Amino acid sequence: MYRSHVTANGLEVAQKWARMSPLPETATGLHVETRGGPFTREFTIRFNAPPDDLDSWLNSSPGTSNLKPVVNGRSRVYNVEPGNGAMHAEVTVDDDTNLVVIHTYWS
């Protein structure tokens, strides 16, 4: 019970801080990593989804909808303007594996 609460809470906070819409319904392999203590908090979210669903999700999310990604080989990096008091938010998409990584933190 505690682990599922931490996962759900971390996902919710990371989505708010990165200003991202709910994950695509087709998302698989969800992994939520939480770090920090009372004065810092960091979240890293990983999941996979089909390419068309990822593009739709990125285009419908306030954090990425108007951004041009930095392309690095087969990866796209979106440097998102963080929300809800966060200091950093970034979304990376690996186009070879369809892996998405949302990384955000507050300090």
Where are these regions (language model features)?
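Extracytosolic low-complexity repeat regions of secreted or lipid-anchored proteins
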Residues: 55-107
